[in-house]
């Protein structure tokens, strides 16, 4: 089995993801009001973990890079389960093991890393020493179906919030692994071409990463400060077979 995956994001009205670029709100609210609202709405979804990409994680929590040069190749690819006193995980996709973890509890949760099989034994020792859980997702670290089975069967995780960035969301969209979309729409605009949007799959021009996936609107709620919360259920073509 795999956990339920809810892609939970905040964007501007034009779908952009960089809040520092948004126009100022019409409403008289605190500077951190919308970001706090996003997190509060996320808590309503009652997930046991959030999942983000390496760039997003390092931008917020552990900026240093681990050098694995000359290390010993891993020969045993068993998952490692560290303690989880909070009952919630922050899971990061780090296929090559680039993050140097300085602490094991980002945002009051417990850290977990999804790795590729090309990391070194020394890096695994580093993770265990700091108290970071880990598991493997195939040779290149992109076998999410395998990773999700481990998350469910070994770690007991049944509900995950996928929180970007755009490229990571695109990978999951292409793989057909998203079950719901929870989108909080900020009452403002970015407007510039090329700024990351909610889903950005890096593929060929003729690829259609969302093919065979239809959205059912579950709810549309106007929140305080003009924020709009949209919830959709994904229906995949295989669901109808």
Placement of each model-derived feature along the sequence:
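Enzymes that bind and transform nitrogen-containing heteroaromatic metabolites
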Residues: 1-241
């Amino acid at each position: 089995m795999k956990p339920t995956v809810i892609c939970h994001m905040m964007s501007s009205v034009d779908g952009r993801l960089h809040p520092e670029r948004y126009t100022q709100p019409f409403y008289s609210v605190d500077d951190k009001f919308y970001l706090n609202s996003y997190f509060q709405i996320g808590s309503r979804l009652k997930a046991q973990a959030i999942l983000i990409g390496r760039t997003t994680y390092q931008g917020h929590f552990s900026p240093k890079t681990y050098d694995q040069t000359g290390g010993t190749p891993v020969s045993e690819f068993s998952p490692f389960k560290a303690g989880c006193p909070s009952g919630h995980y922050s899971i990061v996709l780090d296929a090559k093991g680039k993050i140097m973890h300085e602490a094991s509890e980002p945002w009051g949760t417990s850290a977990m890393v999804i790795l590729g099989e090309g990391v070194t034994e020394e890096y695994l020792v580093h993770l265990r020493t700091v108290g970071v859980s880990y598991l493997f997702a195939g040779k290149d670290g992109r076998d999410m179906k395998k990773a999700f089975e481990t998350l469910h069967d070994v770690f007991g995780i049944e509900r995950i919030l996928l929180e970007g960035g755009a490229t990571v969301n695109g990978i999951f969209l292409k793989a057909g692994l998203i079950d719901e979309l929870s989108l909080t729409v900020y009452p403002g605009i970015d407007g510039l071409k090329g700024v990351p949007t909610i889903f950005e799959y890096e593929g060929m021009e003729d690829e259609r990463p969302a093919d065979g996936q239809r959205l059912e609107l579950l709810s549309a709620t106007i929140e305080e400060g003009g924020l709009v919360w949209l919830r959709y259920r994904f229906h995949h073509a295989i669901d109808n077979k």
